[in-house]
Design a protein with these regions (language model features):
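Short beta-strand boundary microenvironments
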Residues: 114-158
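A conserved hydrophobic position in a structured secondary element of the catalytic/binding core
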Residues: 59-60, 72, 121, 147, ...
Length: 235
């Protein structure tokens, strides 16, 4: 008498095409599961690296899903630091980073380019975005940018096209690449950073997108929340 599992084995041999298709379907499902799990874990690691429990972001109301749509007055950082006691201040410098963040078409010298992420920052940015490290070159001056180590992949360009000394074009202006930075796997690594004033000029904007505020250890973000509630345009 044949055992139950032997019937299954015999059926597999009787229908080889159907068996092969079934095995291919199962293998595809398993592969997709691994791909999705890998993507989720990579996204979690990127978000973990990008986040800082002591950093609070202030942006316009209803822009949390897309910071690019945020627009707040340029005077907001000074109002924040004057109103919130928990802000870190060292050597007379407040750890508050005003930033203008936008997606724009970026073109390299030998490439049609693609949609890139540009962030206009000041010298206060690395004080707040503490995972960012300048690994090569120099901090950008007038008409210059520094690129994240994954910016080339974001644009679909070769690494050598975004090397120091090369130039890129966005917002109708040519920019020289002065440096490269890393951020420990954070999302900033796919961005291009330039001076805030330069980015405001070429984009014809006087506002900013957000303020990143570094709070002192033990401070509560409740003070920042109270400040935002007093101003109905902030969140």
């Amino acid at each position: 008498m044949l055992l139950p599992w032997e019937y299954g084995v015999r059926n597999l041999a009787r229908r080889p095409v159907r068996t092969a298709l079934t095995m291919m379907a199962l293998a595809t499902v398993v592969m997709l599961v691994f791909v999705v799990v890998g993507f989720i874990r990579g996204l979690e690691q990127s978000l973990t690296a990008s986040g800082d429990q002591n950093v609070v972001l202030v942006y316009s109301v209803n822009s949390e899903e897309n910071i690019e749509n945020s627009s707040i007055p340029a005077r907001t950082p000074s109002l924040l630091t004057a109103s919130v006691d928990g802000t870190i201040k060292r050597f007379g410098l407040n750890h508050a980073s005003p930033e203008l963040y936008a997606g724009t078409r970026v073109k390299s010298e030998n490439n049609e380019g693609g949609l890139g992420l540009v962030r206009g920052v000041t010298l206060a940015a690395p004080l707040v975005r503490r995972s960012v490290q300048l690994v090569d070159g120099a901090w950008p001056s007038d008409g210059e940018v520094m690129v994240g180590r994954l910016a080339a992949a974001k644009l679909g360009s070769r690494e050598d096209e975004l090397a120091i000394g090369k130039s890129i074009e966005f917002e109708g202006r040519s920019w020289n690449i002065s440096g490269r930075f890393a951020a420990g796997g954070a999302a900033y690594e796919s961005e291009i950073w330039c001076r805030l004033s330069d980015f405001q000029t070429v984009s014809k904007r006087q506002d900013i997108s957000l303020v990143a505020l570094l709070l002192a250890p033990g401070s509560s973000p409740a003070e920042v929340e109270l400040f935002c509630k007093e101003r109905t345009d902030l969140e």
